[in-house]
């Protein structure tokens, strides 16, 4: 994991976890609802790279995504963390053997691919959750990859001076 995909190696499969089961994480269904068309464009491009082996992991409660993505290969998961972990999902869907090449990609990266294919512009946008006990006003922020944390954190009302900032879902 966390290895850049080698474009010269054909993957056995591509996996996308469309939910994060970690506490205080972003709700991907919330993000995908506003970007479902771009997400589908990105999925269609990935299916060209790995026909019949693009696997989406969906959560049982994601009724919108289950309905919208019915034309794609998905597996529904239910249960506590780490059910949203893509490695756990790969283990259940299509286990990795020695020498296998699989790719994993996050939903927002697929939106970025779809947006690029539709507009020709690279827009690496992200929606992040600012949450947890020290946050008086938990909320989502739309930002870009590489944005300075201060541009976001200056808008948050914290109730504690002892804070831990994590990037992604701290997995």
Predicted regions and their residues:
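Buried, small/hydrophobic-residue-enriched core segments of structured protein domains
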Residues: 1-167
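N-terminal low-complexity segments that are often proline-rich with Ser/Thr-Pro
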Residues: 170-171
């Amino acid at each position: 994991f966390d290895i850049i995909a080698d474009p010269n190696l054909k993957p056995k499969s591509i996996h996308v976890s469309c939910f994060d089961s970690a506490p205080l994480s972003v709700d991907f269904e919330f993000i995908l609802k506003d970007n479902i068309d771009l997400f589908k464009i990105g999925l269609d491009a990935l299916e060209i790279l790995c026909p019949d082996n693009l696997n989406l992991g969906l959560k049982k409660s994601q009724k919108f995504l289950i309905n919208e993505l019915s034309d794609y290969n998905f597996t529904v998961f239910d249960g506590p963390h780490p059910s949203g972990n893509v490695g756990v999902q790969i283990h259940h869907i299509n286990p990795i053997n020695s020498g296998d090449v699989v790719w994993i990609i996050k939903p927002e990266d697929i939106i970025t691919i779809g947006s690029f294919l539709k507009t020709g512009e690279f827009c690496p946008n992200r929606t992040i959750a600012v949450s947890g006990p020290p946050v008086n006003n938990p909320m989502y922020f739309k930002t870009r990859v590489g944005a300075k944390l201060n541009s976001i954190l200056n808008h948050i009302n914290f109730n504690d001076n002892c804070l831990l900032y994590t990037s992604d879902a701290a997995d």
